[in-house]
Structure formats: structure tokens, C-alpha cells
């Protein structure tokens, strides 16, 4: 039953994208616009070859995330999110994945998404493990824990926190 619901949602998104195309509503989005969750869309790879001034999906960035499935196993995440998101992302030129969900244990599958250029690493994620898995395959877009900035100010602690994440990445 859940797969049926996901199929309906996927078809709905595909129809929406097709409608945007038909109405000429697509715009090239590679000029530093905010992209998804915590990224910008700088790229000299888009628009793709053959661009004639009318944006196609292959000329655009797209993104997906699965915060709602943050607590499910990697196997369930692959079956109930990535399987559908993969098909939605396929026609786009570059893609990003993630928001505030910890993808540490799910990156093996996430990194197989088409045209993946950026992965969001949540505050709760193991930055070192994520960096090891991501390597130089795409951009690691880390979101620091905002709670580190509230309460008693400790510049040394904050510098150490940021330095350790930077070293890991």
C-alpha cells in the first residue's frame, strides 16, 4: 500500500514538472541561487550542451530529501524514498540530496543518485564518516549544530568544533 502511495506521489511530481515545461516556466538556476538545503547552485557545467535559450531539465539543478524517513533503516530508505526520488532526479543536469536528516548510514545508496553534486550533512551526522564516504565525489555541505551558539559563549569550544569538522571534510 505504501509503494502505491509513493507511485502516486511520483507520478504527480512528474506531471507537475511536465506542466512547468509545457508552460515555459523553467529557468536556468546555475548562477548562485539558493539550492535545496544549504547550498548554492554555482556551476559552469549548466546549461548543458545544446542549450538554445529554452531551459530543459538537463540544464537545471534539482534536489530531493527524506527528512520524514530519517529514522528508518538504510534498506527502507532506499525502498521507500530513493527508488522514487532517483526517477524524479534522473532528467536533471545536476542534483543535490539531503536536508536535516542524518545520512551517515544511508550515503552508500545516496551516492548512487544520478548527477549528484552536493550532499547535505546534518548537524546530527558523523561528519568524519560522511566525509570518508563522500570523498571527492561531490560537495559535502555541512550544517553545524546551531545549539553551539547559544548559552554561555565559549570561543575555544566553538573554534574546536568547527576545526574538527573542517579537518574531517
Task: Identify the meaning behind each predicted range.
Residues 1-169:
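Active-site loop segments of alpha/beta catalytic cores
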